[in-house]
Amino acid sequence: MNSGILQVFQRELICPICMNYFIDPVTIDCGHSFCRPCFYLNWKDSPFLVQCSECTKSTGQINLKTNIHFKKMASLARKVSLWLFLSSEEQMCGTHRETKKMFCEVDRSLLCLLCSSSQEHRDHRHCPIESAAEEHQEKLLQKMQSLWEKACENHRNLNVETTRTRCWKDYVNLRLEAIRAEYQKMPAFHHEEEKHNLEMLKKKGKDIFHRLHLSKAKMAHRREILRGMYEELNEMCHKPDVELLQAFGDILHRSESVLLHMPQPLNPELSAGPITGLRDRLNQFRVHITLHHEEANSDIFLCEILRSMCIGCDHQDVPYFTATPRSFLAWGAQTFTSGKYYWEVHVGDSWNWAFGVCNMYWKEKNQNEKIDGEDGLFLLGCVKNDIQRSLFTTSPLLLQYIPRPTSRVGLFLDCEAKTVSFVDVNQSSLIYTIPNCSFSPPLRPIFCCIHF
C-alpha cells in the first residue's frame, strides 16, 4: 500500500481528542467519532448537553453505541504497530535471536517461544502478547464503564443534595409558618405546646441542614476521586500494548476500592409534633365524600398531568419512572363554592397516589384542551420508585420532607381563606397548608391512584 494512502487510513482511526488510535470508538449525531472515554471526560459537568470538539454542535446523546467498524479497524492498526515494534532489532530475544511473541503474566515480561518453555518460566502462565494486550484493555474498559456509571449516579445525587441544601431553610420556614397559623385557630392554652413544637422543628431543621452540607461535601469529594481514577484508567488504556502490559500493576484493584462506600443522598424527614385537639376541631366541618369513577378522556388527560407532575425531569428530587402506568381517577360527587369542609382518605401502605380538590374546569376539559401545568389542582401526593419515595403538594409543586402517612390523611378546605390543609390523622399533625389558592368555584374533590 502506498505510504501516503496508509497515512490517510491511519488518520481516520485517530481520536481528535487524545490523538491516539480509537479506544471503544463512538460516533455522535453530528457524525464525528471519538474514544468513548475521551468523549465522556469532555462532557465535564454538563448533565444534558456537550459540544462536539470538532464542529461545536451540541449533542444530548448519552447511551452511545460502540462503532464496531472503527473498533475493528483501530484494533488492526494497533496490531500492525505492535508487530512492527516486536520485529525491530532491539526487541529480538538476546539469547535465541527470535521475535518475542509471548507475555509472562507472573513477571510481566516479553519472551520468545523458547524462553517461555525454559525452566525459569515453565510453570508460569503465558499467552500471546497480542491477545494479552486485548484482554487487559477490555478489562480496563469494563472497569471504566462501571466507574462512569457510578460517577453519573453520584452526579445526580449531588444535584439532588445541592437543590435540597439550597431550598432547605425556605422549606423549614414554610413549615413553621403553616404550624403557627394552625395554632392561631386553637385555644390559647396551647401556647406552651406551640412553643415546644416550633423549637423542636427549628432544631431538627438546623441538624438536617448541617447533615445536608456534609453529604454534599462527601459527594463532591467522591466526584473528584472517581474522575481522577477514570482519567488514570484512560491514560493506561491508551498506552502502547507492550507498555500497557508491563505497567498494568494493581490498577484494577485500586479502581475497585474507589467504587466501595459510595455516598448516598439523605432522606431528610422533618416531622412535626402533634397538635392537641386538631382532629376534634376539624371534625366540626366533617363531610362524607362520595367518589365516582368515570371512564372519560378527561380522566386520562388528568392522570397524565398528575403523572408528569410527579416524575417531571424539571424536578430532580422527584423519582423518575420508566414503567407504563395504569391510572385510576375518581371525582367527588359533591362540589363546593363556599364554607369549610373536612374529610379523610385511607391511604394505608399504598404508594403513587394523589388526592385533594380541583377547580371544576378540570373535569370538563378533554385531553385536547391545554391547561397550564398544575393550575387549579390542590393536591397531596405520594410517589415511589425503586430507589426513593417522595411526598409532595401542588400549587406550587413542593416536596414535603416528612414521614409518609401510614393510615388516614385528612383534608381541610377553607373556601373563604383560600387554603387547603392536609393532616396526618394518626399523628394529629399538620402535613402542610397550601396558601393563597387560586380557587375558581365550584371546587370538586378528586382522587388519583397510579399503578406501575
Swiss-Prot record:
Lineage, broadest ranks: Eukaryota, Metazoa, Chordata, Craniata, Vertebrata
Zinc finger intervals, B box-type: 88-129
Pfam families: SPRY, zf-B_box, zf-C3HC4_4
Family according to the record: Belongs to the TRIM/RBCC family.
SMART domains (UniProt xref): BBOX, RING, SPRY
Keyword Amino-acid biosynthesis: no
TM region(s), chain numbering: none
Domain B30.2/SPRY: 269-452
Entry keyword set: Metal-binding, Zinc, Zinc-finger
Name of the protein in its database record: Putative tripartite motif-containing protein 49B
Gene Ontology terms: biological process: innate immune response; regulation of gene expression
Any GO MF annotation of the entry: ubiquitin protein ligase activity
Keyword Transcription applies: no
Annotated residues for binding of Zn(2+): C93, H96, C115, H121
GO cellular component: cytoplasm
Zinc fingers classed as RING-type: ranges: 15-56
